[in-house]
Amino acid sequence: MVNLRCPVCAGALEKRAGAYLCPKNHSFDIAKSGYVNLLLNSSQGHHGDDKLMVRARRDFLDKGYYDRFIAAVADAAAEFTPPEATVLDAGCGEGIYSLAVLRAIEKAGKHGELLGVDISKTALQYASKRSPDFTLCVASCAHLPVEDGSVDEVLNIFSPFVPEEFARVLKRGGYLLR
């Protein structure tokens, strides 16, 4: 189970009727496209990749140039995943690696629950179309909205590397795939 935490007070977030709510009543609405914005930032505006960049990357990856690499990442993730796993894709973008990993986990006869985190709302809109089963959050890899020691595996492919945060969220014996 994905254990999200409030970016304001670090309390556990509970999903309720279109929003996430913590014990101190901080509330975060779930967007129509399925993601929740847990990025705390005083400046409004655009964060992460814009629509043009996301489309360009998606179009490039959809042509198959990285298929062998994506398959290798997915196979490695499935190999180290326990039978019931929570996988965090830190910097998930459009969810290409996330979806491949979940498929590989299922093919291996295991069950995985995936949390995708990215700073780009646009990227998460595309990720939600790839698979509505992902839990998706707008957040920074430097401040993951995840409870300590709650993740079996962290994927960090072509995204900011924040080892302290990854160590914080990984369960003892968990894996970082980078």
Language-model features, listed with the residues they occupy:
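N-terminal auxiliary segments of SAM/dcSAM-dependent transferases
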Residues: M1-H47
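A short glycine-rich, Lys/Arg-flanked "PGG" loop and its adjoining helix->strand segment in the class I
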Residues: P163-Y175
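Conserved SAM/SAH-binding beta-strand->alpha-helix loop
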Residues: S120
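Conserved SAM-binding strand-loop segment of SAM-dependent methyltransferases
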Residues: P132-H143
